[in-house]
């Protein structure tokens, strides 16, 4: 398995605050995510601004698209995103059209695994060409005390076996990473664990050290 990447999630309410954290962390992460809350507040300009600030990083438009996959993908990739998220509840036609536009633009679609979905759904996404999904505990699940469990790991392994690479998020810390050693991990996504830390670059370094220890290979 390839070495997982480290993704900074920017779920800020203002672009100014998000860009301050990017300034602190852009040299310590591989991927910068324009989070859903940020994009709802700041619009398409958030993606454009992050692309300008981080010309050499992977930029994610975390829009959780449910319809109009082709149109929104064209806007996301046109603004400078490399990846765009589509919610798992979206019709397969939406995923297919979004994926087709991503292919034309040199980007990728990530399926956001929120709520109800099945492994048959995952096989359908893989069949039409999607190769990425995001597995996570949402904010509400974390607040209720939900922990990563065997059921989560079994589902992740099943998704990996289908051929999907997973970005994993939901209160992730460096100490959690050994749980996922048998999973096909594309990236670990951290928001508050990085941006909210007293020493963000040090925490990012701890993530990379754990990734190196488990998966091997130095960061490019």
From Swiss-Prot:
Signal peptide: none
Cofactor remark from the record: Binds 1 Mg(2+) ion per subunit.
Keywords (A to Z) from UniProt: Carbohydrate metabolism, Decarboxylase, Lyase, Magnesium, Metal-binding
One Pfam family, short name: OMPdecase
One Gene Ontology molecular-function label: orotidine-5'-phosphate decarboxylase activity
Classification via InterPro entries: Aldolase_TIM (IPR013785), HPS/KGPDC (IPR041710), OMPdeCOase_dom (IPR001754), RibuloseP-bd_barrel (IPR011060)
EC top class, as a word: lyase
UniProt-listed PANTHER family: 3-KETO-L-GULONATE-6-PHOSPHATE DECARBOXYLASE SGBH-RELATED
Quaternary context: Homodimer.
Protein's job: Catalyzes the decarboxylation of 3-keto-L-gulonate-6-P into L-xylulose-5-P. May be involved in the utilization of 2,3-diketo-L-gulonate.
The name this protein goes by in its record: 3-keto-L-gulonate-6-phosphate decarboxylase SgbH
